UniProtKB/Swiss-Prot annotation:
Gene Ontology molecular-function annotations: imidazoleglycerol-phosphate synthase activity; lyase activity
InterPro entries per record: Aldolase_TIM, His_biosynth, HisF, IGPS_HisA/HisF, RibuloseP-bd_barrel
Gene name tied to this protein: hisF
Reaction catalyzed: 5-[(5-phospho-1-deoxy-D-ribulos-1-ylimino)methylamino]-1-(5-phospho-beta-D-ribosyl)imidazole-4-carboxamide + L-glutamine = D-erythro-1-(imidazol-4-yl)glycerol 3-phosphate + 5-amino-1-(5-phospho-beta-D-ribosyl)imidazole-4-carboxamide + L-glutamate + H(+)
Swiss-Prot/TrEMBL keywords: Amino-acid biosynthesis, Cytoplasm, Histidine biosynthesis, Lyase
HAMAP family named in the record: HisF
Protein name listed in UniProt: Imidazole glycerol phosphate synthase subunit HisF
Gene Ontology CC terms: cytoplasm
Active site: residue positions: D11, D130
Enzyme superclass (EC): lyase
Any Pfam family: His_biosynth
Length: 253
């Protein structure tokens, strides 16, 4: 069984890490390079950076952030937020990212997934899906959770895999930033249908929440932000807890 991964998520706006609730009410959480270095020391398995302003100007700033981080941190870096083209992907991969994450652009241009996988290898391409529960299913939203697409989240995840995605980053908009646990029904519905890893995101408030996403939700990895940014738990504490519950995780010596 592959190790379960614990991945801090850093939302970057104007070169600073921020955190909100259900994608709004942003507050400052620190310097991206300092936070990344701290998480690396604490035993993070990977880091995800999401550029939430994603203007052209900000893309340059983001590439600079990635370049600095890649000199301090020697674990995989995934970067996303507003990527619309192979050129955008190339900029970030050249700056030092190991993977790129596409969201809104993949919905409007699904072939971008295939083109990216063909050029860089599918292990590089992460498709981020922001899903909101509607009755017994989940709808995909784009543009930072503001725009409904009419797409079913489970079906879209399956299609993304067929198109060449190497991983799915699955965020519950309903749970995001509330620290009350992940939507594990959503996680399980998607994970059980795919042959590629699913990263569960949105709702982490405690080590138990991360365990439930990996166990009940059948996710391969868990993404969390505020529980780490504000020092509520360290990555080492979380991983020791997961290990004590019998999950395979990589512990620092």
């Amino acid at each position: 069984m592959l190790n379960k991964r614990v991945i801090p998520c850093l939302d970057v706006n104007n070169g600073r890490v921020v955190k909100g609730t259900s994608f709004v009410n942003l507050r400052d959480a620190g310097d991206p390079v300092e936070l990344a270095a701290r998480y690396y020391r604490e035993g993070a398995d990977e880091l995800v950076f999401l550029d939430i302003s994603a203007t052209t100007e900000e893309r340059k700033t983001m590439a600079e952030v990635v370049e600095k981080v890649s000199k301090e941190v020697f674990i995989p870096l995934c970067v996303g937020g507003g990527l619309r083209s192979i050129a955008d992907m190339t900029t970030l991969l050249r700056a030092g990212a190991d993977k790129v994450s596409v969201n809104s652009a993949a919905v409007s241009d699904p072939d971008l997934i295939s083109r990216g996988a063909e050029k860089f290898g599918r292990q590089c391409i992460v498709v981020a899906i922001d899903a909101k529960r509607e009755g017994n299913s989940w709808q995909v939203y784009t543009h930072s959770g503001k725009k409904p697409t009419g797409l079913d989240a489970v079906e879209w995840a399956m299609k993304a895999e067929q198109l060449g995605a190497g991983e799915i980053l699955l965020t519950s908009i309903d749970a995001d930033g509330k620290n009350t646990g992940y939507d594990n029904e959503l996680n399980r519905e998607v994970s059980s249908r795919l042959n590629i890893p699913v990263i569960a995101s949105g709702g982490a408030g405690s080590p138990e929440d991360l365990y439930n996403a990996l166990d009940k939700g059948q996710a391969d990895a868990v993404l969390a932000a505020s529980i780490f940014h504000y020092g509520r738990y360290s990555i080492a504490e979380v991983k020791k807890y997961l290990k004590s519950k019998g999950l395979p995780v990589r512990l620092e010596n």
